[in-house]
């Protein structure tokens, strides 16, 4: 006899709320319905094992089918089924009261839901205008019933014609969700959400190419692997098994470097396999490759908050029933089990890396370039991981040799300790662009390491804090004598006028570029040293590099690159430039320089007159005289600078020296490089 009733919820109509609330994630309805079918099947297996069901279990599988014409998706199982009383209890009361409770709890925190795991049967209404449940219990003498609801609080319950035990969920898809009537869409969702469920999931037949088109075969199309690699014992798996499982997860990826098999049952349940991929030099492209499962049911691939941030660079699967899924991320991060799981995974990762380093260092070194970004990220973001990684982190020198922290310190401290007792680690970030600086350091007996990774600027700053009496200096940040200061700087023997003259001469020929700023500096580097070279101050350059990954440091990222054009005042060519200016320009500057001297003497007298007086007490005549003096000085200095600039523009030696320095630092390109080549040919 047909029966009508009202669902026991307080909302007038909960279904529009369900649709609206979870609209962006409505595709998970299929996972929920199929998972329920798997649960029903597993319950039958359990009842059979304890003797409560003595009948033939037969072929235990879940079947999914799509009828595009009838606009239905049907999920069928041969599990425990339900009696009429159970339908009343579990669908009309428990399921929908749970729905209402769930929606009320998270109405203000919608974005915080991680997997929407456990939404259950009512998720079918996210895509359906009507849902039919046709079910028959495994119990003897049970009769089949059909429950129907069109999205209003009313339902009908009536006898049904169903010979076998189990349940059919028939979803009549509404117009807004017609996309789910495409077989390709459903197969894709099953492949994502149901790939490793514990009961075979069948979706149609396998196909083959025949007679010019794809045609069904007689073989069932089983979507899932019911016994994936992570559920097996490590002793039962070979390397090829792990690699094959990786290929099933990431078909287009390169082969992993190695892996960790997780298998914990106390004090929490955790299984899984984590793979170390070949990480490219870009953090952002690597994330969200770990898949989280709960008893082999896919939950999410967004595992931030469940594992430490740096571990999101790994690939693989984590399966745990002890991770709370329908909670906010802030709750996740404070959950005791999650903290324990997170710490355990970090420890296992560090254990695995240290094990390979100790037992097979050649292999570890061979794979270091692909591991380095991951290890650095972990060291920067997780203190406990840093403590472990300090044992196997490797520096790489310019010849490709690799050293641990202790090994490298032993190598360099004899010759690379400065006058203050600091061990100076020299490094380059561009093997070719900084070659000349690296060569100067090597010729002096220094070792230079290569730090050209995305996170290296941050690692350098971290290691300066962690390693005792250690300072990192890029090879192009100063002259070779000053990179590792063994003694005080040699005195530069130039007068103030000579300094000012050289500054003006070389500034006149420096490139004009808003993104680059050059400062002329002087060093006494000996007659055998280079005449001119370009350095880049360590602090500002490092801040700019770090700003690329830290939004809060954007101020540094917006500043122009700052370089020092260092003139070796002991070199004959610098002396030649200065001597040439004295012969060619200074005679015409004698009167102007004398005038400047007179103006400065007059300025000093005017300043003396102002001493001890308030601004209002200074005579107007004195103020006017001071202003006129400043104008005249600027005018006279301008005349001097104009003549020096003209001389510099016509002087090929100055241009050649600057371009040689730019070329040595990789800064001479385009038209300037072409002009340098033409000038070099003229000079030859």
From Swiss-Prot:
Homodimer. PANTHER family: HEAT SHOCK PROTEIN 90 FAMILY MEMBER. This is Chaperone protein HtpG. Residues 1-329 are annotated as: A. HAMAP family: HSP90 (MF_00505). InterPro entries: HATPase_C_sf, Hsp90_fam, Hsp90_N, Ribosomal_Su5_D2-typ_SF. Its main location: cytoplasm. It comes from Porphyromonas gingivalis (strain ATCC 33277 / DSM 20709 / CIP 103683 / JCM 12257 / NCTC 11834 / 2561). Molecular chaperone. Has ATPase activity. The gene is htpG. The lineage of its organism: Bacteria, Pseudomonadati, Bacteroidota, Bacteroidia, Bacteroidales. Belongs to the heat shock protein 90 family. Residues 549-684 are annotated as: C. One of its GO terms (cellular component) is cytoplasm.
């Amino acid at each position: 006899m047909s029966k009508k009733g009202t669902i026991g919820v307080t909302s007038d109509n909960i279904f529009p709320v369900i649709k609206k609330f979870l609209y962006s994630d409505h595709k998970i309805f299929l996972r929920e319905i199929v998972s329920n079918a798997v649960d029903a099947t597993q319950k039958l297996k359990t009842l059979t094992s304890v003797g409560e069901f003595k009948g033939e279990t037969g072929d235990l599988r879940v079947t999914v089918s799509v009828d595009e014409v009838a606009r239905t998706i049907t999920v069928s199982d041969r599990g425990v089924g339900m009696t009429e009383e159970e339908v009343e209890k579990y669908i009309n009361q428990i399921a929908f009261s749970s729905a209402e409770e769930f929606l009320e709890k998270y109405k203000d925190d919608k974005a915080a839901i991680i997997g929407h795991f456990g939404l259950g049967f009512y998720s079918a209404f996210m895509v359906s205008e009507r849902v039919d449940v046709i079910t028959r219990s495994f119990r003897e003498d049970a009769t089949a019933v059909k429950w129907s609801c069109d999205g209003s609080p009313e339902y009908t319950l009536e006898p049904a014609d169903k010979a076998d035990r189990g349940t059919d969920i028939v979803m009549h898809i509404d117009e807004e969700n017609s996309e789910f009537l495409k077989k390709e869409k459903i197969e894709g969702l099953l492949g994502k959400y149901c790939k490793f469920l514990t009961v075979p999931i069948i979706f149609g037949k396998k196909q083959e190419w025949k007679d010019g088109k794809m045609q069904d075969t007689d073989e069932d199309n089983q979507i899932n692997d019911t016994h994936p690699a992570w559920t097996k014992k490590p002793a039962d798996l070979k390397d090829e098994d792990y690699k094959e499982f990786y290929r099933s997860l990431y078909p287009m990826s390169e082969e992993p470097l190695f892996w960790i098999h997780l298998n914990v049952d106390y004090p929490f349940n955790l299984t899984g396999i984590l793979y170390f991929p070949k990480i490219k030099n870009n953090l952002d492209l690597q994330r969200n490759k770990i898949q989280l499962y709960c008893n082999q049911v896919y939950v999410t691939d967004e595992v931030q908050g469940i594992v430490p941030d740096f571990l999101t660079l790994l690939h693989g699967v984590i399966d745990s029933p002890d991770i709370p899924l329908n909670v906010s991320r802030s709750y996740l991060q404070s959950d005791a089990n999650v903290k324990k799981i997170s710490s355990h995974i970090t420890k296992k990762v560090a254990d695995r890396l240290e094990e390979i380093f100790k037992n097979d260092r050649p292999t570890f070194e061979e794979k270091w370039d692909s591991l380095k970004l991951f290890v650095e990220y972990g060291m920067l973001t997780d203190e406990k991981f840093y403590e472990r990684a300090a044992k196997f982190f490797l520096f790489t020198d310019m010849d490709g040799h690799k050293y641990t922290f202790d090994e490298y310190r032993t190598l360099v401290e004899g010759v690379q300790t400065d006058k203050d007792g600091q061990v100076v680690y020299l490094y380059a970030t561009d093997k070719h662009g900084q070659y000349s600086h690296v060569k100067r350091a090597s010729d002096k007996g220094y070792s230079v390491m290569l730090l050209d990774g995305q996170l290296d600027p941050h690692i350098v700053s971290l290691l300066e804090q962690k390693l005792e009496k250690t300072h990192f200096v890029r090879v192009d940040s100063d002259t070779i004598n000053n990179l590792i200061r063994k003694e005080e700087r040699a005195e530069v023997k130039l007068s103030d006028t000579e300094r000012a003259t050289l500054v003006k001469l070389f500034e006149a020929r420096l490139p004009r570029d808003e993104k680059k700023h050059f400062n002329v500096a002087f060093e006494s580097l000996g007659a055998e040293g280079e005449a001119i070279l370009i350095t880049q101050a360590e602090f500002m350059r490092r801040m700019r590099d770090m700003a690329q990954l830290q939004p809060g440091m954007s101020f540094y990222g917006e500043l122009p690159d700052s370089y020092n054009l260092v003139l070796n005042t002991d070199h004959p060519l610098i002396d030649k430039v200065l001597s040439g200016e004295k012969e060619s320009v200074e005679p015409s500057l004698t009167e102007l320089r004398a005038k400047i001297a007179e103006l400065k003497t007059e300025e000093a007298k005017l300043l003396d007159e102002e001493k001890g007086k308030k601004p209002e007490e200074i005579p107007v005549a004195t103020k006017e005289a001071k202003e006129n003096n400043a104008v005249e000085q600027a005018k006279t200095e301008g005349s001097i600078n104009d003549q020096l600039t003209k001389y510099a523009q016509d002087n090929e030696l100055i241009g050649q020296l600057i371009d040689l320095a730019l070329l040595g630092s990789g800064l001479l390109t385009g038209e300037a490089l072409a002009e340098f080549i033409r000038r070099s040919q003229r000079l030859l």
